[in-house]
Amino acid sequence: MLDRIKGCFTESIQTQIAAAEALPDAISRAAMTLVQSLLNGNKILCCGNGTSAANAQHFAASMINRFETERPSLPAIALNADNVVLTAIANDRLHDEVYAKQVRALGHAGDVLLAISTRGNSRDIVKAVEAAVTRDMTIVALTGYDGGELAGLLGQQDVEIRIPSHRSARVQELHMLTVNCLCDLIDNTLFPHQDD
């Protein structure tokens, strides 16, 4: 059992090292995409399922409340946080549309959709991205594995941050770290002296 525990930590560390080498450019581009949208008076919509939903809610909460230091609130909405809306849509047998309907209702040109999917194949996330494209929104996608169907939907202005792993637990761990990096970069770009 102890060896298995050490193996989990070792694998996580190795994935973090690989990500630290592979992802800084994509994370930087994503952060600047989010910052520019906010500076233009737009908002960030985010969504995910399961652990990815928790990461989406963590991001939105960090924007609306704060990340590590006090600063003005920033507009972000976790589309997976409203159980009444989700279950109303799903109750009409539109499970794949639970996020897309919200994107079509709330999203505007210049907004960003932060779409989080471990494998990139969740139908409701894919449909949300398709809806965001029709609303002239930019997409920041957090994926893993081979990026899945989601990776193929992204345009030139969009950003994919693909965790270099084929293990769901490692991908999800690194998604949380990536969300924290994005929050830190947004705060330090928009409010550079807040932590002094």
Curated annotation (Swiss-Prot):
NCBIfam families, A to Z: PRK10886.1
Protein family according to the UniProt entry: Belongs to the SIS family. DiaA subfamily.
Keyword Aminoacyl-tRNA synthetase belongs to the record: no
Cited SUPFAM superfamilies: SIS domain
Gene Ontology biological process: carbohydrate derivative metabolic process; DNA replication
Function (record text): Required for the timely initiation of chromosomal replication via direct interactions with the DnaA initiator protein.
Domain of life: Bacteria
The protein's name in its UniProt record: DnaA initiator-associating protein DiaA
Gene name linked to the record: diaA
Subunit structure and binding partners: Homotetramer; dimer of dimers.
